[in-house]
C-alpha cells in the first residue's frame, strides 16, 4: 500500500464518493468536512451526502441518460448508488430516497472505512499534495477566494431552489388521487387537479407574491433544472401548464378527464409521512408562499414542514481549467469534483467524484489516469464539461445528447435511447476493475 495520503475536501455526494473510491484502492484518505463546525445556508445536519434540494435521484430506467449513469455507477461499486438503492422510497420509474437514512448510510460506509480519516475542520487554503476539491455550490468564502486566485477565473453565481415539503396527514385526500404519469411504474405521486378557474386564481397569486430580495452584487442566473416556480410563471401563463403543472397522462380517475393543470406531490421519506411539491422550488417569502400553496386543491390546510428556499450555487469554468480526468490542467495532483465542475444534479456530482477518486488513487500509485469514452454516460459528462465552448459554459445534466452519436440512425426515440444504453453498459464493462 502507498504511504501517500490524498486530501478530499468536502463530504457531499462527490466528496464522499471520491473518498470511498480512493480508500477502496488501498490509499489513505483525509476527508475534510467543515460541518458542523461551520454550517452552510442550505445544510441542516453534519451528515455526509446531505440532499438539500429534492429527495429524488431522478429516472432509474435505461431509456433515460441519468438511469444509465446510475447503472454504470452500480457496476463500478458506487457508495452513493448503493446507499440510495438501500434507502429507496416509492417513486414510480425514479430512484427517490429517505434523505435522512440515505445520508446516515453514506456517512457510515465512508467514515468506517479503515483507510479514511475524517477531519471536521474548515479548509481555507488549497493543500499541497494529492487533493480532490469537492466543496460544492456553497464553498466557504475563504476557500472560494483561494480558488479564484488559483484559477484566475471569475466565478459564476446562480441560485438553486428547494421545493416545499408538506405533511401527508394535512393533505385533503378527497381532492387528490394517486397516479404516475401514463401509469408508468407504481402509482407513486399524489396529484392535485386544477380547473382552469382554479389555475388562473393560483397563477395570479403566484406572480403577485413577494419574493426574498437578492443581493445586488450577485447576478441572477437560474439553471433550468431547478428554476423557481415564480420565475417560470413570469415567462407566461402557459409555462407552468406545459412545465411542472402539465396534466398530460394524469387523467383524474373520478372524472375520467384530464384536468387543466396538475400539481404533483412526491413521497419524501421512507415512512410516507412527508411529500414534496414537485417542481415548486421557490424564492417566495414564507407568508406569501403559504398563501399561494394553499390555493392548490387538496393543500388548503397543508402543514408546511419545510418552506421552499434558495441558495447560491457556484461553478468553475471547467473547459478552460480541467481535463476529462477531472485533473486541474496546471497541477496534475489537484482534482475537482461535483457541482462546482459544472455537472448538474446529485447523480452527476457523485459520478464525477467516482472518476476523480479513481484517478487520484491511480496517480499516487503511479498508474495512468483513466478517461472514460463519451459513449458512456460518465464519460460524456466529463467530456462535456472539459470540451464544450468555455465562453458560454453552463451546468449540464446527463442526457443522451452528450453521448457520441450512434453509428446507425434510429428514428424511434425509445429504441434509440436503448441503443445508447446498451452501448454504454457494454463499454463500461472494460473499466469495472480499474
UniProtKB/Swiss-Prot annotation:
Cofactor requirement: FAD
Biological process annotations from GO: tRNA methylation; tRNA wobble uridine modification
Molecular function via GO: flavin adenine dinucleotide binding; tRNA (uracil(54)-C5)-methyltransferase activity, 5,10-methylenetetrahydrofolate-dependent
Reaction equations catalysed: uridine(54) in tRNA + (6R)-5,10-methylene-5,6,7,8-tetrahydrofolate + NADH + H(+) = 5-methyluridine(54) in tRNA + (6S)-5,6,7,8-tetrahydrofolate + NAD(+); uridine(54) in tRNA + (6R)-5,10-methylene-5,6,7,8-tetrahydrofolate + NADPH + H(+) = 5-methyluridine(54) in tRNA + (6S)-5,6,7,8-tetrahydrofolate + NADP(+)
Location relative to the cell: Cytoplasm
The keyword Ligase appears for this protein: no
First-level EC class: transferase
PROSITE patterns: GIDA_2
Pfam families, A to Z: GIDA
Positions contributing to FAD binding: 10-15
GO CC entries: cytosol
Function per UniProt: Catalyzes the folate-dependent formation of 5-methyl-uridine at position 54 (M-5-U54) in all tRNAs.
Homology family: Belongs to the MnmG family. TrmFO subfamily.
Protein name (database record): Methylenetetrahydrofolate--tRNA-(uracil-5-)-methyltransferase TrmFO
Species assigned in the record: Bacillus mycoides (strain KBAB4) (Bacillus weihenstephanensis)
Lineage: Bacteria, Bacillati, Bacillota, Bacilli, Bacillales
